[in-house]
UniProtKB/Swiss-Prot annotation:
GO biological process: photosynthesis; protein stabilization
Family in the record: Belongs to the PsbH family.
Keywords on record: Membrane, Photosynthesis, Photosystem II, Thylakoid, Transmembrane, Transmembrane helix
Transmembrane segments: 29-49
InterPro entries given in the database record: PSII_PsbH, PSII_PsbH_sf
The name this protein goes by in its record: Photosystem II reaction center protein H
Amino acid sequence: MAIRTRLGDLLRPLNSEYGKVAPGWGTTPLMAVFMALFAVFLLIILQIYNKSLLLEDINVSWESLSF
């Protein structure tokens, strides 16, 4: 038997949705699409940083940022 405490009574509303799951896949496919797009974004940033993605007429050195 669980012991009832004042803190537990205060926190109970935060746990009222425990075990309730929406039927089906929900928004999982949408989340997968955004994760894939984010992975592609990170790969592009990494390739630009490593200079393995060649960009014509775009200088990616730190000197180009100075005035």
